Every structure is written in structure tokens, then in C-alpha cells.
Amino acid sequence: MHQHICKKAIRGTSLILVLCTTSLYGHAQKRDSIAASSDSIHRIDEVVVSAKQMLGSKFEASNRTGSAYYVSPKEIAKLGYTDISRMLRAVPGVNIYEEDGFGLRPNISLRGTKAERSERISLMEDGILAAPAPYAAPAAYYFPNAARMHAIEVLKGSSQVQYGPFTTGGAVNMVSTPIPNRFTAGLRTSFGSYNTFNAYTYLGNDTKHLGYVVEYLRYQSKGFRRDEPDERTGFYRNDIVGKLRWHTSDEASTSQALELKLGFANEHSDETYVGLSEADFATRPYYRYRGAQMDEMRTKHFQSALTHYISFNNKLKITTSLYYNYFWRNWYKLSDISVGFHKGEKRSIETVLEDTEINAPYFDILTGAKDADGEALIVRANQRSYHSRGIQTKAEYKLSLGSSYLGLELGARYHADSEDRFQHDDSYSMHSGRMTLYRAGWGGDQSNRITAAHAFASYLLAKWSFSKLTLTAGLRLEDVEIIKRDYTTKDPRRTGHLRIDGDNHATELLPSFGINYKILKPLSIFAGIHQGFAPPSVAKYYRQKPEKSINLESGLRLNLGTLRMEAIGYYNDYSNMLGSDLAAAGGQGTLDQFTVGAATVKGFEFLASWQPLPRAWRVQLPLQLSYTYTDTKMKNEFYSAAWGEVFAGDELPYIYKHALNAQIGLEWKKLELNFTMRYNGDMRTIPGQGPMADAHKVPAHMIMDASVRYRLNNKVTFTANAINLANKAYLTSRHPSGVRAGHPFGLYGGVRITL
């Protein structure tokens, strides 16, 4: 096993060294043989920014051979959102359900992939994998703070062959604030309902050879959930990032840059898995039970990346990054309730809240209505640490072949990540609504294991354009080795004498092909096919196979004046779908994957934007509409701890079949108003088919938001945002445990200052 990993590391590192050596050799040749010309002079910041992004602009997104969406800086500023869930609502094909109301840990699905903890998307920041351990433990309990992002990119379909390891649904790239090309400083702050405060500030500059930017985000709230007495239910987050870049001058014939990025973030949130009963949701949807008074989440995150860029006459560009991320978290939260002192009398909060009448003695302890001695409430310290590190490189080459154009991109990445679980349970008694520690656990008495992964990935993408036709063909390799070392709860010192080892390995070649043909100047059609992949986990009793699928899409784009329209149909045929045992999805929280088997996901995506008024008018009325239809079906019968009994024909849970988002704006002189409406149809919370039972669905709901911006001058802009204008108490999920509500009405005012 270890020899295989070493060979993989050597193979990956060798390829990267070859590419780097080629770049240095090419640089020397260039200096010796080519004089600087005006055609080769271009700003290095353009090279650096493009290397970190998948798209870079809405224009690029609208000219792919597959589906793509670019959330621009202007779009982010217009709506004023700090919640990634709301930022992505307008993107067709994106399926999101809320959990905490602030977007702290979003649940994002692309084209019907599993939404829980965004574990089936390739999540990146500046082109580098950002999930804590995307191969070993893909559930993204860390998500980059959307409030400090410059732009957000979403790729789906055959256009995402460069990005992995999750290639069925798509990729999301969070683009952080770039180093400016001149001195720039800014402050963006807001304050409002529930003592919610958000402040973001940055400072940056660029000189002939040196550039930098430093940014800081503070995000905090008292929270909109309350209990009796008034317990802490809020959160705070800090996030600081700095970038330092050395680069050649603009006059250099060959542009180079070396950039160092460092970041630290932490969080303390009083979040819980405890929801509400149906009866309590109907009368007090923002209530929190007393049994959750000890629940809290603490996290620390450190990121670092050293990136080298080189561009030869703007024809050959090579980007190489060395990166390391560390994430630690301890989610201390209620897990089980016990009546008496015996294990047989212990029940999970999920079970208790499913039927509060049958479980009345347990429910009374949860609410504090009944005193209980001994080990009445079991609170679990879900302490885990994650390491993620690697080296990646890509080379982009552009070539003119007569009247046609050829673009080649070759990339490789060696990546290693790990999750270290060292969890324990504490027991509390309940007296007069207050919890008191009865018995403290010891580290590792609930879970004590390490899961590690080593992966080598590479790809080749070719793009050929001639006249009105564009063809792309790509091939991706994913080779991953996963190792699990369970030291068991009986060996907290990890001596290894009781250790249970397991491993798994998967190697897949993933082809893709796309076509774009411009029928008329404003109208084009496109289609694509690619193979989907997701790495497997280590199963106890059998060697689990990776997730595999064949995915097809076709669509058309119309760009006529100020009218932009896109319509796409897709069909994902899974030969082997995988599910995960997540506590966030109602499972036991082992993170072990289970085999769903054959399944299909098909859907339709529509996007339209229009400026109906002439540009010469002082008043503008921008309109945008997006719609997503998603139909899922599993073809096998099986049982899992997370989903229970599943039958052929059942639909996947937590996927909206219908989702609609509409935006209307009013722009007049220095004033800008925007209204957003989103509608989500009924959504299943467990696998099923036919009519949805009320106890197993999230009912359809429509939520309206609004934002106002007044530009006092070029440096100062006043902002106001309203969330959930109708103050609708709407249900967002029935997991992790019990019913929970979305964000109620909130009003926030602030100012943006730019120097």
C-alpha cells in the first residue's frame, strides 16, 4: 500500500517538475531569442487573476461548450448578500436548502447531487481545493466566507473536466479579493436585526515589482432563535487574508510572478442539531429547547499557498501552486437523551423529535419540563482536525492554425488530506431547566480514528475553434488511495494494539466532449457529454467502488441586444451512486459511504436577463429570471442507516423539483433598488415516490428580499437590505434533528467606502 502511495507521489511530482523545468527552459530561450515587442506587453495582474479563475467574466461563461455562471463583483454588491445560499439562488441548476439561516454551513447541490454539507461539489478558493479533506472526508464543515469574496464561479457539465474530484455535478470556485493595480482601500459595514454586524475592510497596492493586499472580515449576530431563559444562540467569525506578490515589470517580454497567500479564520457559533417538534414549529418557530443550551461550534482555519506564474508572449502560460490548509473544529452538541441510567433507555434526538408523544419522557427532559438525574443528556464533543496539502500545475498554450484557433491545457495535481477524529461524550443532568455536568468523558471514548487519502489527478483539454464552430475534448485521470486507521474507543492513547486498518483504491479515466455552434450571430447551440466521478470511502466489509455516471447536456444561448437567454436540458445516468451517513442528514454521523447503485437525474435549466428600457434613458429596469427543474430516481432497493428502507423508483431527498428566482431592479441616477423573489416547490426529506407525506416534506414557499443602494459620490455608497420582507415563517429542513425555520424578517443598513 505504502509503495503504491510513494509511486503515485513520485509520478505526480515528476510530471510537475517536468512542466516547471519546461517553463524555465522556455523562459531562457525566450530571453535569448526574442526581443520585447508591444504585442507581448500586458499587465501581470491580468495573468495572475485569470490563473486563479475558471471563468473570469460573464462573457466567458456565456461562450463555454458547457453550462457555466459567473457571479460578478457588481452582482454581489447589488444584492448585498453575505450568505452564500442567497448569492447562488439565481444560478440555474443549483439546489440549496438552509440550515442556520446565515449560510455558515451551506448545503449545495449541483444538478441533483447530494446537497448535505456540499459534499458532492468540487469546492475551491482561487482554484485550490478548499474543503477540509475533499478525498478522505468530503463533507464541507468549512466553507469560505462569502462576505469577503470578489466573485463566485459555477461550472457544470462537460466544461468542468479541469476540476475534480467531483465531476458529476460541477465545481464552485470562490474568487478572493485580488491584488489591485494601484493603491486601494475600502470599508464595507452593516448593522441590523438580531444585532447582526458585518464589517469588511481591505488595503492594497501595486508597484513596479511588488504588490500586496490585506483584508479582514468580522461577521457576528446574536441570532434569531430564542429560548427561556434567553440563552446564547448567535455567532461570530473572524477572517484575515494577506497576499504578497513579486512580479516582473510591464515592459518585460516574459511575465512572471510569485505570490504568497496566507489566511486565518475562526468561528464561535452557538449552533445545534436540535430542531423543533411540529407542534412547536406551528406556534413558536424560532424557539430553542433548553436541552441545547450547551451546544456550540468552535473552529480554526489556516490556509497558505505559494503560486508561481509565467507567461511567454501571452501564448504559453504556466501556473504552479504549492498549498497547505489546516482546519480544526469541535462541535459540542446534544446527541442522545436517556431516561434512567441504562443504555437501553437512551434515544437519539432525531428519534425523540420524530414522535414526541411516544417519546414524551425524553421530550420533557429535552424541553426542561422534567428534571432528570444522572446521564440524562449526552452531549458529544465532535472534535476533528483536518490537513490538506498538495502541489498543482497547469500549462495553457494558444496557437493559431490559419483561420482556426487551438487552445491546449495540461494540468496535474498531487494531493493528500486527512481527517483525525478524537471525539468523546459528556453526560448532563437537568434541573429547573438548567443542565449540570454529571460525568465528563475522556478523549476518544466515542470515536478515535484517522482517515487519510493520497491522490494524483491530471487532465488534458483541447479547444479548437473555426468560424462558427467550437469543439472541446478532454481527458481526466483520478487515482486515489484512502486509508482508515481505527484505534477504537478502548485505546485513547493510540498505542495501536487494538487498531483496525482498512484501505481502498480507485483509478478512473474520465473523458469529456463538448461542442458549440453559432447558428446566427446572436444564437448558438451547444452540447456535451462527460463521465462523472466521486471517490469512494473505506467500507467495513467490502471494497467500495467509486461513484460513476455518464452525463449529457444540450442547450441554446441567445444574446440579442440587452436580452440574454439560456436554456439547457441534461441527463445524468449513474451506474453507481454513493450516499453518505451524515448526522446532518439524519444518519449516525460515521461519514461512511453506502452504495445507492443505479440512478438517474434529469432536469431543465433556464436563465434570462433583459434591460427593456433604452440605454439612453436615465431610468433602467433590469430584469432576470431563472428556473430549475430536477427529477431524480433511484433504481435499486436497499437499506441504510441514514435513509432507512429505499425502494426502486424512490426520489432522492433534499432536492427541490421546482425552483424559481426572479429579480427586478430600478436604477435612477444615484439610486438603485432591487427586489428578489425565490420560490421552492415541495421537497422530500426522505427517499420516496408518489404524493409526499406532510411529515416527510418541506412545503413549498416563496420568499422576497430587497436591497437599496444610494451612491453619494464615487467614494461613499449607503446600503440597506431587507430579508424575508413578508416575515414568513417557512420550514427549511427536517434534519439534522427536528423541524427548523429559515431566516425571519431582517433589516440591515450600512455604508461602503472606497479610497
Feature roles, as predicted:
Residues 60, 85-132:
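Extracytoplasmic beta-strand/coil segments of soluble accessory domains associated
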Residues 311, 317-323, 327-331, 335, ...:
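Membrane-embedded beta-barrel scaffold of Gram-negative outer-membrane proteins
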Residues 401-402, 465, 571-573, 592-687, ...:
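Gram-negative outer-membrane beta-barrel transporters
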Residues 46-79, 104-107:
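N-terminal periplasmic "start-of-domain" segments of outer-membrane beta-barrel proteins
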Residues 128-156:
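Short acidic/polar hinge/loop motifs at secondary-structure boundaries
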